[in-house]
Amino acid sequence: MAEFPSKVSTRTSSPAQGVGASVSAMRPDLGFVRSALGVLALLQLVLGLLVWALIADTPYHLYPAYGWVMFVAVFLWLVTIVFFIIYLFQLHMKLYMVPWPLVLLVFFVAATVLYITAFVACAAAVDLTSLRGSRPYNQRSAASFFACLVMIAYGLSAFFSFQAWRGVGSNAATSQMAGGYS
């Protein structure tokens, strides 16, 4: 029968070391905020907030067109917040199995199309649902204007995401690992 060893070497580690490493990885990437994609995301968040806040301050529930505008504005605003946080804290680097440039491209193209429909619905319904010069008229007109600006911002993001997905101006593998923002 085999002898049991008289000495056993063991190693211990502090659990605080592992926690500190994950906290330091959660630092915000200020380079993303300064990039074209980061600036456009901030613009989309601010302008999208203006769109749904202006519509929400009117009796929008009486008109189906504004229900659609509210759905598009709030839904895309929330999804943009999620993507902004993912890129700001570099969580896309930890989720490397997700093709982030393609995901962003699909999202931004879909967001552009949805905001085109929301802008058209909002702009077309202003005269039909409000008296010219009234407070709801002015708010809905302003919401239409900001919806147009958000639509343009999402379109620009789709263009930049397409370039990142194609790898224009850089190695495609480097673009994937760098998060695809310039």
Curated annotation (Swiss-Prot):
Record field: compositional bias (Polar residues): 7-16
Intervals, Cytoplasmic compartment: 1-35, 90-99, 163-182
Residue ranges that the UniProt entry lists as topological domain Extracellular: 57-68, 121-141
Keywords: Cell membrane, Membrane, Phosphoprotein, Transmembrane, Transmembrane helix
Keyword ATP-binding: no
Modified residues (Phosphoserine): S9
GO cellular component: a single term: plasma membrane
Transmembrane segments: 36-56, 69-89, 100-120, 142-162
Any Gene Ontology biological process: regulation of transcytosis
Covalent S-S links between cysteines: none
Domain annotation MARVEL: ranges: 32-166
GO molecular function per UniProt: identical protein binding; structural constituent of myelin sheath
Bilayer disposition of the protein: Multi-pass membrane protein
Modification comment: Phosphorylated.
Residue segments, region Disordered: 1-20
Subcellular location: Cell membrane; Myelin membrane; Apical cell membrane
InterPro entries, per database record: MAL, Marvel, MARVEL-CKLF_proteins
Tissue occurrence: Detected to the sciatic nerve, brain and kidney. In the sciatic nerve, found in Schwann cells; in the brain, in developing oligodendrocytes, especially of the corpus callosum, of cortical white matter, in the optic nerve and in the stratum radiatum and stratum oriens of the hippocampus. In kidney, segregated to the apical surface of renal tubular epithelia.
Role summary: Main component of the myelin sheath that plays an important role in myelin membrane biogenesis and myelination. Plays an essential function in apical endocytosis. Regulates epithelial development through the regulation of apical endocytosis. Part of the intracellular machinery that mediates basolateral-to-apical transport of ICAM-1, an essential adhesion receptor in epithelial cells, from the subapical compartment in hepatic epithelial cells.
Quaternary structure and interacting proteins, as annotated: Forms oligomers.
Family stated for the protein in its record: Belongs to the MAL family.
Name of this chain's protein: Plasmolipin
Species: Rattus norvegicus
